[in-house]
Amino acid sequence: MAVIADPVSTVTGLLNDNWVSGNTDSRTPKVGDSWDIGKTNMMKKDLIKCYEVSGTHEVGLVGKTLDRGTWRVSVDMSTPTSRSHLRNMYGEVLRIMRLKEVDPNSSYQLLRPVSRVDNTDKNKRWFRYVLDLELTSYEVIS
């Protein structure tokens, strides 16, 4: 039986394994699950936290032998540097997601960006985007 992988670990793994620091001013952010990163001083480094926002599970598709899971995972990017550096980080995340949107060697069927929110501090002390991704995967039921 194929088991649906953890969606948050899937996204953090993709970011860590495919990040090209040359696209972000030769800097690689700290990337991790929100529960692994814990409290981190956002004023000192680039940071990407990933966490699950919601998920659904449809049981019994295709003659009751296939389950489909759909999750929304947030990719929370922040930097104290500048808005242009944040845009570079955002561009790199999108590049990776487009590269891996449909990957036959992955634990998911489809990964796509859904929405983005600008949560930049109004005093411009730190710059932040939250990008929501939708991840779909299937599990074979025996």
Where are the model-predicted features located?
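Small/polar-rich, solvent-exposed N-terminal microdomains that initiate assembly or binding
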Residues: 1-63, 100
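N-terminal short leaders/motifs
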Residues: 20-30, 76-88
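Acidic-leaning, charged glycine-interspersed low-complexity segments
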Residues: 21, 94-142
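Short, cysteine-centered beta-strand-loop-beta hairpins and adjacent loop/turn segments enriched
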Residues: 57-60, 78-83, 138-142
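Short, solvent-exposed beta-strand/turn "edge" segments of beta-rich domains on protein surfaces
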Residues: 61-67, 121-124
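Oligomerization/assembly interface segments of phage tail-like spikes and tubes
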Residues: 65-81, 127-138
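Extracellular/virion structural assembly segments
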Residues: 67-70, 78-98
